[in-house]
């Protein structure tokens, strides 16, 4: 693995729009431990190609500033997912975040793709971390199986608002559902 901040010391994770240059510039100056170039929710499809083009510079800058450089790709079921992943591995990203991680086979597919791309780009095998994003009730139900992919999966994020919607939880100012 790369010599990056250990997972248990990553206190702040900053998601920025993959093609939103002013937010990327602000991330450069932030104190975030992990900066994430976000392709799925924060980047409209028309801007993804541009975002992939600037990715090598974004990743290099974050690394130079001592940040864990991460990319949240589109799901691999989306045609842009593999394009995002290819760009991320070629840019020497530290960590790949996979949205909508609902089933172990999705992680298996991602691991296989990452390994093949590491070989293709001459990157050390198993050097790219994977962080599944569990956003739906079915992903929560399958979380243990998803997280057992130990050679690559270093952590998981739960998208609290998406999860709340998936669970059909009532949301209001006094709601405590996201406390658990």
Which role does the model predict for each range below?
Residues 1-180:
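Expand to "…catalyze enediolate/carbanion chemistry for C-C bond making/breaking, isomerization
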